[in-house]
């Protein structure tokens, strides 16, 4: 079980890294192409000897740039997947911010009770949205509508929307893991990010000024 959890954690991190890299690469290529052809045209005006060659290359680059109208739609789709995978990843790594000042003033048993209540609320929210979004994706699947600017690649709207129920299912699993840890007395709360504690750690590691 622990081995499976480690494999999934690595896969989750790999998917997030891939999505970030793909978004960056697509955007970079699109921006370069849209600026390169103007540079080639300017050089063609300045260099008479290579005028025809530079114009031909510029025309080719311009054609590629015009054909990349799908880049914006793809970037948005990748970003949507990144968001919902990132929500579950944030729950696992305690990356989400929360206000728990009053909770920390309570005794440890009370903190555990409040943690269970908060965890159950999060489970209910994630479960509700998972079921609702599943029905939505099912409707998109039946309709078979192509994704805007991506339909010529065979990408349908339900392909992009599929991450919504999947993402909330992952969030549900992560909060279920937290609930188990709370009930086993291995954790008291949701494990939210603590900016104050992080700032103190950074201060402690700073070298003393001369």
Swiss-Prot record:
Subcellular location: Cell inner membrane
Cellular component GO terms, alphabetical: plasma membrane
Recorded phenotype for the gene knockout or disruption: The dctA-dctPQM double mutant shows no growth on malate and fumarate and residual growth on succinate.
Listed GO MF terms: transmembrane transporter activity
Main location: membrane
GO biological process entries: C4-dicarboxylate transport
Topology within the bilayer: Multi-pass membrane protein
Keywords: Cell inner membrane, Cell membrane, Membrane, Transmembrane, Transmembrane helix, Transport
UniProt superkingdom: Bacteria
Bilayer-spanning residue ranges: 13-33, 77-97, 113-133, 160-180
Induction comment: Expression is maximal in early exponential growth phase and declines with cell density to reach a plateau in the stationary growth phase. Induced by the C(4)-dicarboxylates succinate, fumarate and malate. Positively regulated by RpoN and the DctB/DctD two-component system. Negatively regulated by DctA.
Similarity field: Belongs to the TRAP transporter small permease family.
Subunit structure comment from the entry: The complex comprises the extracytoplasmic solute receptor protein DctP, and the two transmembrane proteins DctQ and DctM.
Miscellaneous field: The DctPQM carrier is more efficient than the DctA carrier for the utilization of succinate at micromolar concentrations, whereas DctA is the major transporter at millimolar concentrations.
Function as written in the Swiss-Prot or TrEMBL entry: Part of the tripartite ATP-independent periplasmic (TRAP) transport system DctPQM involved in C4-dicarboxylates uptake.
Protein name from the UniProt record: C4-dicarboxylate TRAP transporter small permease protein DctQ
Organism this protein belongs to: Pseudomonas aeruginosa (strain ATCC 15692 / DSM 22644 / CIP 104116 / JCM 14847 / LMG 12228 / 1C / PRS 101 / PAO1)
Lineage: Bacteria, Pseudomonadati, Pseudomonadota, Gammaproteobacteria, Pseudomonadales
Gene that this polypeptide is encoded by: dctQ
């Amino acid at each position: 079980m622990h081995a499976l959890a480690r494999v999934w954690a690595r896969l989750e991190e790999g998917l997030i890294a891939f999505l970030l890299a793909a978004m960056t690469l697509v955007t970079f290529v699109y921006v370069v192409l849209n600026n390169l052809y103007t540079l080639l045209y300017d050089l063609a005006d300045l260099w008479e000897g290579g005028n025809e060659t530079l114009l031909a290359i510029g025309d080719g680059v311009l054609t590629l740039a015009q054909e990349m109208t799908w880049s914006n739609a793809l970037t948005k789709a990748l970003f949507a997947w990144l968001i919902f995978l990132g929500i579950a990843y944030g729950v696992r790594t305690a990356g989400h911010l929360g206000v728990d000042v009053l909770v920390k003033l309570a005794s440890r048993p009370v903190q555990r009770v409040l943690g269970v209540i908060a965890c159950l609320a999060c489970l209910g929210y994630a479960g509700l949205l998972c079921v609702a979004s599943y029905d939505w994706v099912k409707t998109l699947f039946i309709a078979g509508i192509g994704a805007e600017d991506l339909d010529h690649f065979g990408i349908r709207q339900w392909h992009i929307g599929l991450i919504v129920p999947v993402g909330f299912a992952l969030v549900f699993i992560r909060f279920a893991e937290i609930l188990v840890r709370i009930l086993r007395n291995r954790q008291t709360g949701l494990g939210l990010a603590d900016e104050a504690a992080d700032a103190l750690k950074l201060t402690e590691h700073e070298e003393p000024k001369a």
